[in-house]
Amino acid sequence: MFKYFPTNYVWNLSVNLAIEMGARIGEIEEMCAPLQEAAKAPDAAGTQAFRATWAAMADKLCELAQEDEARGRLLSAGEKYGRAAAYYITCERLQAHGAPGRLALYERCLEVFSKGLRLAGDNCERVEIPYEGKVLSALYVRAQGVDGRAAPGRSPLLVQINGLDSTKEMKYRVGLPAWLARRGVSSLIVDQPGTGEALRLHGLTARYDTEHWASRVVDWLETRADVDPKRIGMEGVSLGGYYCPRAVAMEPRFACGVAWGANHDWRDVQKRRLEKEGSFPVPHYWSHVQWVWGAKDIDDFMRIAEDVHLDGVVEKIRVPFLVTHGERDSQIPLKWAHRTYDQLVNSPKRELKIFTDREGGVQHASFDNSINAGQYIADWVAETLQGRTA
């Protein structure tokens, strides 16, 4: 794990995530060098300072991209807009719920990200899935054939979902959809209830019965002529290590599942966090989880969290399932990966992969070095859904 700030895990997590999304080390230095003292400040003051330097860098990249556009250099402009979006979302996710300007910052990220995709000509399309009278926004990435072009006919697809505080743009830029596309597998990266646009723009909060929205996603995929409905899998990162196994257990149309970071008993994690055990993923943690889950107060949240566990659930999974975990995860103890794996008694192909110092990706959901872990997952999915690995 790259520890730019010696005493601030949350900020180091954010820097590492940004690097995984394509941040440049010179820009990291320019943004972070003025923040050494702010990193020691209370959450409110510190996160405002973090936002100021990171948003300024994103603004500068957008100005440079506009200069590229004016000269007809659209590919370069698209790359800069994409990197700017990564910096916007990095500082947005650290802000407190309701912080002045947070929503505008998020909307700016969406705008810049979309422009970056278009100008760069990326294999990525924004789509919307009807849900509860609103929509779940998602990014659709098409499988590639061996010649690098869009694969003909119906392709296997992996639905990819967020954790507690990630967004579809973050997951896209980390790289799993591109790695899958090269292996002949399409991707649908979803802002499910409690995350991204669903939470910020539509007020859709998280729910423990994830099959409620996951089934609607499968319904939508079954209408597409380029998706093989018999080869739809799901992957979840971080808290998605709860969301995904639950959905795969309860929605029989999923053909496989992957937990990128196990999260078997999130209710227990909350109890430990109340006792100051384990690392927090974001500042303002308790107000953040209440917002995500639509809780009135901390007591209401703890009641909601009582349902967020996989005991009695994982046994219902009857398709291949991969559980991965970082050996040095300081947010979610490794024991929960073993618990999920041990309860996958009815899966015809279960696997537990623990990432060690040798491979890298030892931190929570491999945020410290995602490429080896992510490509391991991509290979497993391709093998399971009949894509290709060569």
Predicted regions and their residues:
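Primarily recognizes the serine-hydrolase "nucleophile elbow" in alpha/beta-hydrolase
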Residues: 89, 220-275
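Short alpha-helix in the alpha/beta-hydrolase fold that links the catalytic acid
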Residues: 319, 333-343
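Catalytic active-site module of serine/aspartate enzymes centered on a nucleophile-bearing elbow/loop
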Residues: 367-390
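Alpha/beta-hydrolase active-site loop
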Residues: 204-226
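Catalytic histidine neighborhood in serine/cysteine hydrolases
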Residues: 341-362
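N-terminal cap/lid segment of alpha/beta-hydrolase-fold proteins
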Residues: 52-54, 58, 104-153
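Short beta-strand/loop motif that positions the catalytic acidic residue
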Residues: 317, 323-325, 329
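Mobile cap/lid helix-loop segments that gate and shape the active-site cleft of serine hydrolases
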Residues: 273-313
